Amino acid sequence: MTSETPDSASSAPVHFATLASLQARVGQHLATSPWVLIDQQRIDLFAQATGDHQWIHVDPVRAAAGPFGTPIAHGFLTLSLLPELAASAMHIDDVKMGVNYGLNRVRFMAPVPVGSRLRGQLRLKAYEPIEGGAQLTMEVSIEREGAVKPVCVAEAVSRRFI
């Protein structure tokens, strides 16, 4: 667990009344998501959807004898959790829709063994007004329960519209 991580997170998302209210929160921690279980079924479904069937992910017998001692989640599966983690952590009441705009500075810091529980820490890095809404840059740190360092860090850039 990282030093700025609360020991527990509420399962209810943090509510912000307006998108504009986030402008004053730049540089601050906004929310922590609930834990998400990464089981073999999720890994297998991701492999099926992406065509990445590397044995370290989908062959438990072979993976047990491999470098991690168990199957591990795809790095991109971990990254693909960003929308789920963000949506379960926070809600902006006046936002009608949002779209992904891009990613910056993505790093996979540690493997995610099957059976791990992950959660996201969300910190608002930037708020830029755009027509009809705002562009948000969120620093997301994905943590594995019981681990010292994050498994993935990324800056997620999204556009939210009111």
Show where each model-derived region lies.
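HotDog/MaoC-like acyl-thioester-processing domains
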Residues: 2-24, 111-162
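Catalytic strand-loop segment that frames the active site of acyl-thioester-processing enzymes
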Residues: 4-73, 90
